[in-house]
């Protein structure tokens, strides 16, 4: 019985700590932040936006890539030819009035061949304020609802090493 408790305890601790270690920084252009319900009346102005981020070490040509609403409205923006995102840069895209629904929206980034490169989790934004769904750190896999930071960093993830000096 004691062995069973020890095994279950180890599994519990591993399960709790695993998500913290399982999060990774992407090696491709990502959807870094989305505001599906910005302050104001979405039907009166083009105000919904998507921020892309390039965590790689190379320029990426986004010509013909698509940013798509995949739920109710199914509206797709095609990124213009000649659009380049440099390493570490952010690009903001607006499309048209009411691009997204405010509840249960999933946004996809597709390359010029239609291959899905990145997706958001299902997001809900009923606040009509200055908050957005964003990665907790630029390019990181966790998402949070926080004060919008369009075109700028959500924060950089810093890894620490436990190695001892020689």
Predicted regions located by residue number:
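Intrinsically disordered, low-complexity linkers and terminal tails enriched in Ser/Thr/Pro/Gly
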Residues: 4-9, 18-166
